[in-house]
Amino acid sequence: MAAKIKRDDEVVVLAGKDKGKQGKVLKVLTDKDRVIVEGVNVVKKHQKPNPALGESGGIVEQEAAIHISNVAILNPETGKADRVGFRLEDGKKVRFFKSNNAII
């Protein structure tokens, strides 16, 4: 199945503790159907020190993955969450917003 949400897309969270937050997609984990969104689902990870790489240990905050069904792409024209469709334009497959047919 084609990816409706890709890296660097602006998305809004639809469900969960961060509902309503907006952010940029940093990574898409296609095999697990999850995305990592900037500033969303921030967790504290206990990091061991690694002298070989020069990393000090401690508690690090980082974004955790959330399920792709809990995010929707943000339409910049309307400022709201929108659905994505696919169509062929000049022999190329393009993504478009279903609300106003604008190409992403």
Swiss-Prot record:
Gene3D superfamilies: 2.30.30.30
Sections of the chain in a coiled coil: none
Molecular-function annotations in GO: rRNA binding; structural constituent of ribosome
GO terms under cellular component: ribonucleoprotein complex; ribosome
Keyword annotations of the record: Ribonucleoprotein, Ribosomal protein, RNA-binding, rRNA-binding
GO BP terms in the entry: translation
Subunit structure: Part of the 50S ribosomal subunit.
HAMAP family according to UniProt: Ribosomal_uL24_B (MF_01326_B)
Family: Belongs to the universal ribosomal protein uL24 family.
Record's protein name: Large ribosomal subunit protein uL24
